[in-house]
């Protein structure tokens, strides 16, 4: 369960940061037809309660694609996050365009500008988005409960809940599992605390 949770949370976090940073950079620093419409469509998806799309998504993933009890069913629906795109777009709007223009003058490609200039400058915001995404999927419960039925494919939170039924509420293993599930989050926060606090103040006015 711990390994499953680590795989799912890590892959989803890396994917959302990768796609979110590219989309955020394009929406913040690039001018192209329909940019504002795309951004407002993105915002509108954040207003839709997840319960509205849950049943169609479940039918698509488990019945149409046959991804029940697989890593694909746990990972693919969360590969892109509109919240991450929105947050990174807002953070990248504060980055000075002069640095990117200077890199282009020095014959840097657009990929080089994104990789060597934008990502290092946006590291605090990326850290915050990464922490929120990782924690959210580390503690995810409802979707893994729906798409997994085999014990070998369960995630940590679903596995802990199953102690009530499979082991007649074994409080000892449950408490031990709860502590184990909390430890990685605590370690990650203290390891990235400096970037996390910087990211929370992105866009703030400094006197």
Enumerate the predicted regions with their spans.
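A structural signal for multi-pass alpha-helical bundles of membrane permease subunits
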Residues: 1-207
